[in-house]
């Protein structure tokens, strides 16, 4: 039987000067147990209030991505239909379900068939078979050949239609300019969330890889891809595009015509003693509240004699009106083109920003951009500003080693990240997970009764998240009235221990280091365990804080599955230095299974790296 325990600790007011070195946790006065069922709101159901577009563009550098450990899923061969799935891509449909695509590892990972699977929750996946299946053809040379498919990519249009693309190539003709039109891109459409699909049809002809698509506010579609020139070099690329003004029914400039060339720069291949084009594997977004497009690309950097190609990450931006300046001039077979002096573009770009490959780019509605890329078999992510021009430090979250990672938005405060996981060469699959966006939140303005009942928090849904170490996870919400600042911490935990606890840290919004105005409140399953300030270390001090804890669990009993616990906390305004209606906060969850799990490491001494709470 799950039981509810309510712990209440009310510390008598004492002089702020009255403090002592922190001693053992004091615990709290026990209130008789009573049965209940707690309703704990998961992070994905919070932050539902609509913020203004780019609401956090000015403080993007304080935003933090946090792994949601519970969301980690490994999708294997039994689902994807191939023993070594590669180049995974996920698209979220209009009905809230998901499609995962991947191709097989044929020809060193270049692929022959694109497989797909569906899910309603990102956890349970249903195999759907082949979306673009390799097939026998007679090529232009009169040979028995095979049309091979690779790089599946999906996009949901504003009308709910799903467009799926795959690059194709034909054996025996791929490396020849004369037969370039036996390669290209095919598309399929679904108007019923993937239940049925149109027959594939060609939207572009010419060697290519890694197509992605954008839809602008006017409904115009732009399909970008790595344009390949294999008759010259396998490392001779650049990003080109075709476009549609009728929802993807027809594409310009038309089959058999050279594409619109939009992004490329030159590099020197010492191995072949050639100048070549680069900027491939495009990842593009239309920036919030703008028509400007920002793109990230894999760029060949150098190919030393006796070595291998080294890749880096590059960026490019369209003009503000979103219209690229096309790189004019027919190339034909390219033999008469002096690549070293050839036209490149666009003018607004950054080349060789970091070492890496296979990038992806997204933007949250609140303004933060996120770039991902691969390096040394790991996926790395960086948070950037609202123009995708400045980025913070790189961090890795996905618990996998492999290649061809990607990211996509899932709501306003989460992203999905995934990649081919080849850590175990005998069990290759796709590993995916969610990351939560922790950024500035607003306190709701209302009085909270500190009784362990979270019903008075219904209209306070700005929330922070901790939960990267194990299945135990916590959210934090804030409210305030004229007398107190309130916090609700909800902990979802399948195995609650009597020794679990949370810590809420509070600092003035202008504090650059921990000091005597930095507060900490520690709350465990028996109520308020400790409270105090920082003076070289944490000093116990009566802040007048109150806490009530309730749990829906059998404590320290692993034989069943618990729901979790919550804590309502109040801190008098008189104990908190509020600057311009703001404070800095940090949340740390200690769970016996995963240890300490904080939004920002509790070893961080600069509160400016904590999260801002406004509305105070």
Label each residue range with its predicted role.
Residues 27-145, 155-207, 215-273, 286-351, ...:
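Beta-rich carbohydrate-recognition and catalytic domains
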Residues 452, 484-492, 565-571:
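Short, well-ordered beta-strand segments enriched in hydrophobic/aromatic residues
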Residues 85-87, 149-151, 208-211, 279-281, ...:
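Conserved positions at the start
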Residues 2-9:
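Sec-dependent signal peptide recognition
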Residues 20-22:
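Bacterial signal peptide processing site
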Residues 440-451, 505-534, 573-616:
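Acidic/polar low-complexity flexible segments
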Residues 15-18:
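C-terminal motif of bacterial Sec signal peptides marking the signal peptidase cleavage site
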Residues 334-337, 495-562, 615:
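Extracellular/luminal beta-rich ligand-recognition
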């Amino acid at each position: 039987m799950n039981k509810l325990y309510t712990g209440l600790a009310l510390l008598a007011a004492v002089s702020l000067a009255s403090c002592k070195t922190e001693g053992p946790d004091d615990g709290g006065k026990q209130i008789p147990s009573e049965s209940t069922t707690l309703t704990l709101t998961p992070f994905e159901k919070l932050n539902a209030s609509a913020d203004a577009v780019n609401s956090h563009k000015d403080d993007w550098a304080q935003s933090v991505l946090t792994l949601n450990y519970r969301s980690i899923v490994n999708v294997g061969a039994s689902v994807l239909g191939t023993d070594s799935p590669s180049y995974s891509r996920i698209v979220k449909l209009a009905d809230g379900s998901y499609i995962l695509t991947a191709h097989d590892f044929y020809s060193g990972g270049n692929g022959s068939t694109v497989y797909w699977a569906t899910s309603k929750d990102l956890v349970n996946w249903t195999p759907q078979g082949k979306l673009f299946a390799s097939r026998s053809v007679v090529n232009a040379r009169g040979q028995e050949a095979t049309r091979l498919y690779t790089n599946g990519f999906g996009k949901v249009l504003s009308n709910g239609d799903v467009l799926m693309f795959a690059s194709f190539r034909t054996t025996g003709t791929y490396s020849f300019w004369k037969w370039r039109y036996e390669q290209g891109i095919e598309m399929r459409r679904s108007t019923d969330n993937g239940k049925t699909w149109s027959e594939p049809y060609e939207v572009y002809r010419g060697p290519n890889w890694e197509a992605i698509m954008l839809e602008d506010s006017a409904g115009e579609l732009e399909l970008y891809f790595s344009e390949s020139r294999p008759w010259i070099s396998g490392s001779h690329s650049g990003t080109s595009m075709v476009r549609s003004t009728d929802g993807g029914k027809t594409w310009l400039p038309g089959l058999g015509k050279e594409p619109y060339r939009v992004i490329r720069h030159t590099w020197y291949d010492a191995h072949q003693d050639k100048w070549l084009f680069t900027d491939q594997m495009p990842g593009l977004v239309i920036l919030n509240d703008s028509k400007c497009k920002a793109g990230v690309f894999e760029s060949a950097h150098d190919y030393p004699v006796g070595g291998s190609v080294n890749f880096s990450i590059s960026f490019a931006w369209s003009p503000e009106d979103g219209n690229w300046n096309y790189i004019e001039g027919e190339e034909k077979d390219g033999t008469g083109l002096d690549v070293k002096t050839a036209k490149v573009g666009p003018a607004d770009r950054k080349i060789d920003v970091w070492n890496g490959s296979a990038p992806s780019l997204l933007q949250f509605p609140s303004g933060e951009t996120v770039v991902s890329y691969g390096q040394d078999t790991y996926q790395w992510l960086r948070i950037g500003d609202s123009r995708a021009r400045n980025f913070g430090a790189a961090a890795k979250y996905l618990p996998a080693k492999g290649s061809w990672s990607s990211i996509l938005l899932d709501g306003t405060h989460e992203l999905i990240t995934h990649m081919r996981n080849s850590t175990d060469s005998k069990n290759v699959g796709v590993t995916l997970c969610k990351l939560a966006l922790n950024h500035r939140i607003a306190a709701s303005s209302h009085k909270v009764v500190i009784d362990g009942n979270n019903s008075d928090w219904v209209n306070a849904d700005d929330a922070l998240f901790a939960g990267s170490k194990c299945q135990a996870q916590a959210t934090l919400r804030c409210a305030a009235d004229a007398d107190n600042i309130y916090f609700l911490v909800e902990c979802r935990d399948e195995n609650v221990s009597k020794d679990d606890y949370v810590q809420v840290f509070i600092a003035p919004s202008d504090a650059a280091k921990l000091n005597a105005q930095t507060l900490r409140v520690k709350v465990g399953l028996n109520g308020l365990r400790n409270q105090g300030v920082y003076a070289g270390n944490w000093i116990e001090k009566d802040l007048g804080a109150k806490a009530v804890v309730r749990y829906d669990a059998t404590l320290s009993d692993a034989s069943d599955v618990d729901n979790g616990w919550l804590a309502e906390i109040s801190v008098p305004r008189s104990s908190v230095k509020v600057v311009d209606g703001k404070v800095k906060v940090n949340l740390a969850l200690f769970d016996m299974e995963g240890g300490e799990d904080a939004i920002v490491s509790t070893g961080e001494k600069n509160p400016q790296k904590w999260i801002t709470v406004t509305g105070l």
